[in-house]
Amino acid sequence: MAEEKKEELFTSIGNAAQNVSTAEDREGNGVQEVESLCMECGKNGTTKLLLTVIPYFREVVLMSFECPHCGFKNAQVQHAETIQPEGSKITFHVEDKEDLNRTVVKSQEAIVSIPEIQLEIPGRLGQLTTIEGILSNVVDDLSKEQESRKESAPQLYDQINAFIEKVNSLRSGSVPFTITVDDITGNSWIEMKPGRDGDRWSQVSYKRTLEQNTKLGLVDTDQPEDVKTQTNNASNTLKHDATAVEVDPNEVHTFHATCPSCSHQCDTHMKLLDIPHFKEVIIMSTVCDRCGYRSNEVKTGGEIPPKGRKITLKVMDAEDLSRDILKSETASLKIPELGLDLFPGTLGGRFTTIEGLLAQVYDELYGRVFSQETDSMTPEQVANWQQFLCNLTAAREGATQFTLILDDPLSQSYLQNYYAPDPDPNMTIEEYERSFQVNEELGLNDMKTENYEKDGGKK
């Protein structure tokens, strides 16, 4: 019954636009109108509310306010769904003017940054906009008081004008740049296009800190200080406990930890697994009975190899889909025939089969990006998504041959060799020297592993 009521309230933008009329508005269907106070002039204006489903994303409430007395207008978006179990950071590299039309869903907690011009937009009102719309808002906000600054603070006026010119150069589409949306609620999104973005679009999920959970109201601020301290140090306690206990590969060890979603205590289960012809890895699973959060991770250990490793496998039939695969957090995965390109960090660490990994990719893309509500997509976009998902389904069912490329700069990933210890005729393994930039991103350039005790004691 609750689900049916929810479906009645939330309709797609296209359906709402087709069905809304003046009579329906008065009855509370479609767009709803509410009289509300104007914060500019103090008189009453009108707020319009639309409960809708964004095809690229999830259910939201679109709000638009207009005051007939002073002409003030305002629009914002609020999420109607719950806070996600993890935060998310989405990065997209803009190359041309067409990319500026990408849809952006930005929650009120999201921080937008463009490193090329050292721009960071803090969280404020939620927005349903485009990349160009975000840049336009920046220009509008900076231009508001420019006339008064020209007389009172000419130096500041010139500095802001110079920055506005930089933003306008990005708006023209002639200068490539990178935009990042970091949202601790996990409720923000940048539109992606399958088979076209390559390595330009990436998403990384992360666990929230205690401070972030407190900001979102997920932690009881009235709890004793010692409980907060215990919660804040739970992850460190888990690490110390894991290293202090002798791990038996035949047992599942359980440690007390903290749920990254609601910050309440829960149990983390850990098991040591020996992968033949590879190394020992740790599989960790967390389940929170309070909020239902679930997480499965694979951690590899040992020293960092001097070289990276790229594994290429020709998947010939359904039998190859049963091969075990360990994709570490630092590994990227590509399937050129499908136009599939997963950045390092996507899906986290996973130990499964090729079929299982493709199923996870399908579920993530279909549930997160593509849905049956495709009214805001162009026919070409719908066709591209349908073809991409169809090809992905054929690959996971063994109906088509493809090439799987697993590239890990830390050599912490694994792909099962059916012929081990002999070479696999359909698999090639290449070792390569990591570039300075890759080592910089991994934090290896400044890492000191020898005589650090002596250097640490210098004053």
From Swiss-Prot:
Keyword NAD: no
Paired cysteines (S-S): none
Subcellular location: Cytoplasm; Nucleus
Statement: the UniProt record of this protein carries the keyword Chaperone: yes
Cited Pfam families: jr-ZPR1, Zn_ribbon_ZPR1
Ranges annotated as C4-type zinc finger: 38-70, 259-291
Keywords for the protein's UniProt record, in alphabetical order: Chaperone, Cytoplasm, Metal-binding, Nucleus, Repeat, Zinc, Zinc-finger
Gene3D superfamilies (UniProt xref): ZPR1, A/B domain (2.60.120.1040), ZPR1, zinc finger domain (2.20.25.420)
Function of the molecule: Acts as a protein folding chaperone for elongation factor 1-alpha.
PANTHER family tied to this protein: ZINC FINGER PROTEIN ZPR1
Protein name: Zinc finger chaperone zpr1
Native organism: Schizosaccharomyces pombe (strain 972 / ATCC 24843)
